[in-house]
Amino acid sequence: MYNFALIGAAGYIAPRHMQAIKETGNNLVAILDKSDSVGIIDRYFPEAALFLETERFDRHIYRLSKKGDGQQVDYVSICSPNYLHDAHIRLALRNNAYAICEKPLVLNTWNLDGLEDMEKDTGKKIFHILQLRLHPSVQKLKEKIDADKSGKIYDIDLTYITGRGKWYYYSWKADMAKSGGITTNIGVHFFDMLTYIFGQVKENIVHYKSDSTAAGFLQLERARVRWFLSLDVRHVPADLRAQGKTTYRSILIDNETFEFSDGFTDLHTRAYEKILAGEGFTLKDARNYVSICQAIRNTDAVGLIGEYHPYLQNIDK
């Protein structure tokens, strides 16, 4: 049994980490969150110590590491806001623990370079939650593409719309410097999945950017990808809005729907199982999507020219 600490317990993704820690037979001993609205802990690890200040949390896990008798923290799971991931990963490694971090691992490629040095200095590894890679449908599609030796280039339309209310624009998520923007917030797992299956980026074009919407084109080794991401519920197809739906997700591959709506419930647990078996995703697995999102963030939109997503034809200018 390993001892875990968790940074960021009040967010929506943290319970999946708590569940994964429990289902893999391990123990959560310490939690850091600036909010004390973390009653969800009672469902999984009611004996875990809660800290509201980073300094006291840091001191606590350091002291545990010196006590011996199996009390040291072996892994620190990180579910904090995007811009804090780098610092919290470093905190874990400084305390002789492995880090398990939610995506996006970091916001910029130079953060990855620094963390590689930190791994070498401490001898501890940084693991990464990329659960879509473990989805059965994604694995099956990757096997199909890998087996196709024809060199065919596939045409893909990625559309993801998830409505967000006014609260979003008052939170850290709306701050580009803290979140990385819309592509990092809601697009990162798709970009990772597509490059995992269809290969490296050869061209990255941005057609449209606003606070709530972004769209562009990616030329991958084995695919041409038109992508559209939005937080504006008005972009959800009208028939779905009439049903009260606020989210729409679609991936078309050569005009055929790629279906992977189900099978998400245990993916974090599977990710933890692989990490504990020494087979988890690492820093190198983050570089593609970090590079994509960083480039999009720093690139001006070119407008509706070239291979742009069809949803842009009707978007409010």
What are the residue ranges of the model-derived segments?
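Beta-loop-alpha module in the N-terminal Rossmann-like domain of NAD(P)-dependent dehydrogenases
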Residues: 50-100, 104-116
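C-terminal substrate-binding/catalytic lobe of Rossmann-fold NAD(P)-dependent oxidoreductases
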Residues: 213-266
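Local beta-strand N-terminus motif with an aromatic residue
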Residues: 28, 47, 73-76, 150-153
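Rossmann-like dinucleotide-binding domain that binds NAD(P)(H)
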Residues: 166-236, 287-291
